[in-house]
Amino acid sequence: PFTTTELLRMTRDFGFALYDPQRLRLYDPRDHIDVDVELGDGTQVPYLSERLLAGLFDRPDPRWPWLIVRRAEHHYIQSIFMEGRAVVIEHRRRGPDQHFSATTSDRQLAQRILWNWATQTPGWEECLSWQRVEIGADT
């Protein structure tokens, strides 16, 4: 049997979408970018598209309401969906001394920030007021 990640890689490579009926989610690789995405339930997705990101924002998993988009071990952006409409966004460059957080109740803005970060579109940081996150040495 194949893992979800293996199936997502295969369907991406052939240009096919994959529907997960348990999570009511369509993984559509059209117009994707190659980044690593980790969903709150542990699902590893080897790409991101605007359609997939929109679906993740429209229907976050209520049990594990977050996602991480990663370029490298200490270079990522993540969102945590709070009750109501609020979204906490955190991003890190290089290490714990470069970890920042912001909160918005505008989910479309949060989605746009994650997409612009993932596509390296300039200006995404100016959309919110970021606060440095103090993280202990063991993190």
Walk through the language-model features, giving the residues of each.
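Acidic, proline/glycine-rich low-complexity IDRs
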Residues: 2-139
